[in-house]
């Protein structure tokens, strides 16, 4: 690798997911000449919504750059790939009707495959937990697929593209492994294999599988701009999230390196996407969650319904104590603050600035699960601006009280807020110069 190779940018959700990453990625592709977008982790448990070209796109496993005719799209080795979902999503978003789409996407041969049996196991494992211990999984088989990867009986895309008899034997062994744990599982092995044979033929015909590590390094060497697109959110990271109520991969910046074969020294900027308030899907700790009219108002105005699950999102005030931790771990160089306009009609707005546990001020979030329930939140209160921000395109045109809110967040986490979302459309974005 030459020293002239271009640095990559990484975009991550800084909270519990659903921060509005798709909108920011879409803006960057259109305005910063992004040549390659790359997914590095997760699977079709993610959900990105992009509103562009007069229509709404929903992405779960596809990189958001797929809607741009000039952008190449990579699904990296760290992603777990459900091929049924992959082809279905291409059709649902109208990609298959675009000429030459297959020349703009590559799936890593080293990515692991998600099978129907993984989804069944996901559901069985969740059902076996007591109500208070349920994780709130999407039942897409993501966790069990990563478990197979670690157990070393996982099956990769390369296996599918090689000798099909060997692939079939590996698959049968995988099913038997799970049937020993869950005897009630019913799997149409022959039907599943027939479907994967069709997938194999389609992948080969369209030449969709390749060496994504080599491709990205080649693009960098040639001076192309690569944007790595994180899924889920930093507070759902398997190591640094609110364990065990987390996803099954590293959704922090380290996942960009391990999930694509990109060295840490190749990362030039890390953009953290932050919603102006806090949301969470499923179970797990949420110290600033609101159970009153304000919470219902955030849910209603913000249209807080999960793209992947269809579940209503839990809503609360933004948690700067957790956001500062997120910034510490990921080294954000820029922040994109989204959905600021949702707060336009709130006369009082709160932000969490600290935690106490048993009367003691905490310097870090609790590492022990049960401790979260006893956390006391320290808030700072702001007077709402009570003016519409939708349509504003310059930072100085925002209401003064709104700017005070933004400035406080910046100063608390010590990262500049460069992008401010004030509406769903692509153009509903304020771009600030770094101070």
UniProtKB/Swiss-Prot annotation:
Its cofactor is Mg(2+). The keyword Mitochondrion does not apply. One of its GO terms (biological process) is IMP metabolic process. Its EC number is 6.3.4.4. It catalyses: IMP + L-aspartate + GTP = N(6)-(1,2-dicarboxyethyl)-AMP + GDP + phosphate + 2 H(+). CDD domains: AdSS (cd03108). Belongs to the adenylosuccinate synthetase family. This is Adenylosuccinate synthetase. It comes from Caenorhabditis briggsae. The gene is adss-1.
């Amino acid at each position: 690798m030459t020293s002239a190779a271009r640095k990559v940018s990484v975009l991550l959700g800084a909270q519990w997911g659903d921060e509005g990453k798709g909108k920011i990625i879409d803006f960057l592709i259109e305005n910063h000449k992004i040549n390659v977008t790359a997914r590095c982790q997760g699977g079709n448990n993610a959900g990105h919504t992009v509103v562009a070209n007069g229509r709404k796109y929903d992405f779960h496993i596809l990189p958001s750059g797929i809607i741009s005719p000039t952008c190449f799209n990579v699904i990296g080795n760290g992603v777990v790939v459900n091929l049924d979902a992959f082809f279905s999503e291409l059709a649902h978003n109208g990609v298959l009707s675009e000429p030459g789409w297959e020349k703009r996407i590559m799936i890593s041969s080293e990515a692991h495959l998600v099978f129907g049996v993984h989804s069944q196991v996901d559901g069985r494992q969740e059902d076996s937990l007591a109500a208070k211990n349920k994780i709130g999984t999407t039942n897409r088989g993501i966790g069990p697929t990563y478990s197979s990867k670690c157990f070393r009986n996982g099956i990769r895309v390369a296996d599918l593209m090689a000798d099909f008899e060997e692939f079939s034997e590996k698959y049968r062994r995988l099913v038997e492994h799970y049937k020993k744990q869950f005897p009630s599982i019913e799997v149409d092995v022959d039907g599943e294999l027939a479907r994967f044979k069709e997938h194999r033929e389609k992948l080969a015909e369209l030449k969709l599988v390749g060496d994504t590590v080599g491709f990205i390094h080649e693009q960098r060497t040639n001076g192309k701009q690569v944007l790595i697109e994180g899924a889920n959110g930093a507070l759902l990271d398997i190591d640094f999230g609110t364990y065990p109520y987390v996803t099954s991969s590293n959704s922090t910046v380290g996942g960009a390196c391990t999930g694509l074969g990109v060295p840490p020294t190749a990362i030039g900027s890390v953009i953290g996407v932050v919603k102006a308030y806090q949301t969470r899907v499923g179970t797990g700790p949420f110290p600033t969650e609101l159970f009153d009219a304000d919470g219902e108002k955030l849910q209603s105005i913000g249209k807080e319904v999960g793209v992947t699950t269809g579940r209503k999102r839990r809503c609360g005030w933004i948690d700067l104590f957790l956001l500062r931790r997120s910034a510490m771990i990921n080294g954000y160089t820029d922040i994109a603050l989204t959905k600021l306009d949702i707060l336009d009609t709130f006369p009082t707005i709160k932000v969490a600035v600290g935690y106490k546990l048993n009367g003691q001020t905490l310097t870090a979030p609790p590492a022990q699960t049960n401790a979260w329930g006893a956390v006391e939140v320290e808030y700072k209160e702001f007077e709402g601006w009570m003016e519409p921000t939708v349509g504003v395109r310059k930072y100085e045109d925002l209401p003064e009280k709104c700017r005070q809110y933004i400035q406080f967040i910046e100063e608390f986490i010590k990262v500049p807020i460069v992008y401010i979302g004030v509406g769903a459309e692509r153009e509903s974005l304020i771009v600030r110069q770094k101070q």
